[in-house]
């Protein structure tokens, strides 16, 4: 049985799901569930499980809450860590300080001027991902969006299209892109800046793999300053400022956050 905490609890309460014969409990993306406020739900699910069971916990980061789950609900756990190798010497990291109303124009300019392989453009909300993808298409760029608002079938088709090179630009949120293994990504664009260094590192780690060169480009406006300051607290990151090039100021056809206001994370 695979499900979100809320759906699992719903079935338990309606007695349409029984844990009586459960042997293995898997907590996937534990850090993300905790960040989204699901710790109480996760604990209720764990307490409903048989005491005699195997528990596996997967987490990209080990926060205090994840440690809490491990210590309280796991017996003599064994830790296994794995990460993709990114050659820092082959990863160029730069940022442009640009007014927010010119951010999309700069992105279009860079995508058209840079010689790239596959490109990932990160946004912090579903609506921004849709906004960017739809307007990139309007200006002749082959882009497609992926985020938590899409069905699993649609996400799978989107990823197949991107991996096959049928679409060269994937506009995505952090949640939707988690766990994806994509080869030949040459450029990462942060259209919206990460909220912390952990998210930033996850993003840029998708390029400069297996000895290949890669570039991470962040577009920083006033709404990104707070997150960017937190990212720069990590001394291991070498993000250099870049001078703004000459570029045409274009007008997006679809407004940012259209269809219900700015928001819709994931």
Residue ranges of predicted features:
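Intrinsically disordered, low-complexity RNA-associated tracts
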Residues: 250-266
């Amino acid at each position: 049985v695979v499900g979100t905490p809320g759906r699992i609890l719903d079935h338990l309460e309606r007695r349409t799901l029984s844990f009586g014969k459960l042997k293995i409990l898997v907590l996937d993306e534990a850090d993300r569930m905790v960040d989204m406020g699901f710790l109480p739900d996760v604990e209720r699910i764990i307490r409903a499980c048989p005491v005699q069971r195997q528990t596996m916990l997967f987490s990209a980061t080990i926060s205090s809450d994840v440690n809490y789950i491990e210590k309280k609900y796991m017996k003599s756990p064994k830790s296994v860590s794995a990460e993709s190798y990114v050659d820092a010497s082959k990863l160029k990291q730069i940022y442009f300080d640009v007014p927010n109303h010119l951010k999309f124009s700069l992105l279009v300019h860079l995508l058209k001027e840079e010689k790239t392989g596959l490109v990932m453009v990160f946004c912090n909300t579903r609506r921004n991902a849709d906004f960017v993808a739809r307007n990139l298409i309007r200006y002749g760029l082959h882009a497609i969006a992926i985020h938590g608002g899409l069905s699993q079938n649609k996400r799978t088709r989107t990823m197949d299209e991107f991996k096959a090179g049928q679409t060269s630009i994937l506009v995505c949120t952090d949640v939707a892109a988690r766990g994806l293994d994509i080869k030949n990504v040459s450029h990462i664009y942060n259209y919206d800046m990460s909220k912390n260094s952990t998210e930033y590192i996850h993003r840029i780690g998708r390029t400069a793999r297996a000895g290949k060169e890669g570039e991470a480009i962040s577009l920083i406006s006033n709404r990104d300053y707070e997150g960017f300051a937190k990212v720069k607290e990590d001394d291991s990151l070498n993000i250099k400022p870049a001078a703004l090039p000459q570029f045409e100021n274009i007008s997006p056809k679809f407004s940012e956050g259209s269809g219900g206001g700015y928001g819709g994370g994931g």
